[in-house]
């Protein structure tokens, strides 16, 4: 993947302004509520019986933060995201058996959550760069499934 200087700046700018403790949980909670079938991977996380239960679940919140921090690896290795995520792809496919379509669902929920937080600053150009970044991450996480 080729990144322009502008794309790199936009992506790094988004993450430099993020409150991981806020955005990570909100994105994962949104995914689990909007796409309830994704909850099947979180059975050990406790009560997921309602939107309120999911929203108040501390294990879900902590995992949302972990997922968001996991994107830091991609930020640090933007020119080699596929290789950077090779082990995570194996983990999610062979150990956790996560449906790779769920990566895109979470990416969409993350985009919505960040756009809501950034408001008018989340311009179409910002979305283009961010979408490209997440598409590469989603592809890398799903690579083991091919």
Swiss-Prot record:
The keyword Nucleus does not apply. Pfam families: Globin. Residues 2-146 form the Globin domain. Keywords: Heme, Iron, Metal-binding, Oxygen transport, Transport. Red blood cells. GO terms for biological process: hydrogen peroxide catabolic process; oxygen transport. GO terms for cellular component: blood microparticle; haptoglobin-hemoglobin complex; hemoglobin complex. It comes from the Eukaryota. Heme b binds at residues 63, 92. InterPro entries: Globin, Globin-like_sf, Globin/Proto, Hemoglobin_b, Hemoglobin_oxygen_transport. Heterotetramer of two alpha chains and two beta chains. Belongs to the globin family. Involved in oxygen transport from gills to the various peripheral tissues. This is Hemoglobin subunit beta-2. It comes from Lycodes reticulatus. The gene is hbb2.
